[in-house]
Amino acid sequence: MRLNEIFMSIEGEGIRTGATSVFVRLHGCNLRCSYCDTLYAVEGDDFAEVHAEEIVRRTLSYGIPRATVTGGEPLIHGEIRELLEALDRNGVETNVETNGAADIPARWPNVFYTMDWKTPTSGMSGAMRMSRAASLTERDVLKFVVGSERDLDEAESVVRELASLHGDPRPTVYVSPVFGAMPYDRIVEGMRMRTALRDFARFQVQLHKIVWDPKRRGV
């Protein structure tokens, strides 16, 4: 596997916001989002080739029962099943951050998925499939990074369709701003004006970009 970095920090977003976790960042992605803030994990050769067992060993060495596997896009790696299975077996509650353009490989008791549905501002919305979002469970997270009213419309449409399938969207739904692109109050007002987002979604900001310099790595 191509490992870009591994470090300990706090969760900056999602259902574990503020909790200390071990972050495993894998290199490589099948998308090229316009606002990507981790291009160093997408392009170039800033990575080391390591086996899944070595990543597990290093993760466990921190002594923290939580991990986030991110990228890039972690689900495109051949050893991802082996990695997640081993983390699960060792009792590590693992959040897998995926871009919505790769199928969820399997389910394990200690593993959940955070799917980032790509809105039009990303330039990658054509890669999204409702079937992938519909496969998320109550343990998972679906997030929308928005930078325009059109993005909010897209999020509203997806959440409404998921709610029609299940009675509620099933995963916990978050709406986040593209950093620096749209005023927070405008996003919140937009959520209030859209029924599905008002009823089911939560607004969030990336906490780590408030605590540290937004461009800082390893946090």
Question: Could you say what each language-model-derived stretch is?
Answer:
Residues M1, M8, T20-S21, R32-F112:
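Conserved Radical SAM active-site core
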Residues I76-V219:
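Conserved AdoMet/S-adenosylmethionine-binding subsite of the radical SAM
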